[in-house]
Structures are given as structure tokens and as C-alpha cells.
Amino acid sequence: MGQCLESVKWADEIIVVDSGSTDATVEICKRYTDRITVTDWPGFGPQKNRALAMATGDWVLSIDADEEVTPGLAQEIREVLQAPLAQGYTLTRLSSYCGRFMRHSGWWPDPVLRLFQRGAGSFTPARVHERVELEGSVGALQQTLLHHSFRSLDQVLQKVNHYSHEGALALHAQGRRASLATAIGHGLWSFIRTYLLQRGFLDGREGFILAVSNAEGTYYRYLKLMYLQDKAPRA
């Protein structure tokens, strides 16, 4: 968290919304801002909209705790906001996986809309895979937003469980249904897409590990959905 906040300390205001962390996150945040709100966890989209509602500046830069604005990107943002030509801008995100920055596997290039005029955009209410809905034109910045997404295998396993849970809840809310066969099929397809079609094999061993963890996450998402649709114990 400190690495993230250090990279944006040049901002006019820093707003942090914490969903009840039990480590030193809040204490770290206090070194950079007093605009800290501790609340429940309604999902990624609703949580980011809570933070957005607290903003007072003309422009909003939304980043997650595991992301870092590079000095080059910070300079590019400051320059473009002197005379903006669009209502929002995508950032070029480069993500790491267990110590390797991934240039394939469907992770690159990864443009994400994170810089936008306050009042012109908001986040979709999705629990996972939220995105900004913007009224107006979108430009593109060239410098890099670093995403330290998975620092270790332990974190991979934790996030597989978390995201599969959130994904299952989202699918269940949409009325989607699943079976063991669909869970297996979606998981297998996820591996094929990541490792072969998106050339994950060019990312070395981390490309293979990512393809397997993607398959696991997809498999468990639909498996959890299967049990959500019928919580009664099975013989």
C-alpha cells in the first residue's frame, strides 16, 4: 500500500476507502492522507463509486492498492491535464505475476480507463471486473501503470478463492446456472485460451502457472455457482 500511495503523493487530494483490513494498511495510509474511510465490502464497482463520491477535484485518478504510478506516467498526467483534449484517458498497465512482468497471456497490452473528469464518469456496479462508464471522448496515455498483481503463489491461491467467490455471486445475481460439466468445460477452455491462443507459453514458467490458475479460478467460479443455485446437501 505504501508503494502505491508514494507514487501518487503529488496529487491534490488522496482518498482511501478501506474495507476492514486487519493489518497495518490504515496506519500506512495515515502517512499520506487523512481522507480515510473504513467501511464494508459491497464489491469492486460499488466500493470505487463510494470513493468517487468523496472526490472534490476536477479530475479523478483511480488506482488499486497493488498498482503504482511510474514517474513517467505521473509527469504525463500532469502535462495532459494542463490542456486536456478528452474527458477520460486510458493508462497502459503492465502486470507482474510471481515476479515476472507478463508480455503475453492476455495481459499485455492492457489499456485501462482510470483518469477521467469528475462528473463525466462512474464505475459500473459489478462486484468484479468493474469498469468506468464515461460520457465523452477517451484519449490514451503512453507511460506505464505498474500492477503488482500476484507477488507469490500464496497470494495467487488467495486471489483465486476470492475472485471465484465474487464471480460466482455475480453470475448467480444474473440468473446464470452451472453444472459440473460446465465448470470443467469453462476451466479447460480458460487454460487453452491463456496458454495457447494468448501465447502464454512465451511468458515461460509463469505463463504456464498463470494459465493453470486461470483455469482453476474459472472452474471454481462455476463450481461455486452450482452450489449457490442449490444449497441443499447432496447424498
Question: Locations of the language-model features?
Answer:
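A conserved acidic beta->alpha catalytic loop
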Residues: 7, 18-27, 64
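Conserved donor nucleotide-binding strand/loop of the catalytic core
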Residues: 26-54
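Catalytic-site signature of metal-activated, phosphate-bearing donor transferases
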Residues: 46-53, 58-59, 63, 70-235
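Cofactor-binding loops of NAD(P)H-dependent oxidoreductases
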Residues: 39, 63-65
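Acidic helix N-cap motif at the loop->helix transition within catalytic regions
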Residues: 2, 23-32, 72-73
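Short, well-formed alpha-helical segments that are part of the catalytic scaffolds
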Residues: 1-10
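Alpha/beta-hydrolase active-site loop signature
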Residues: 21, 42-43, 67
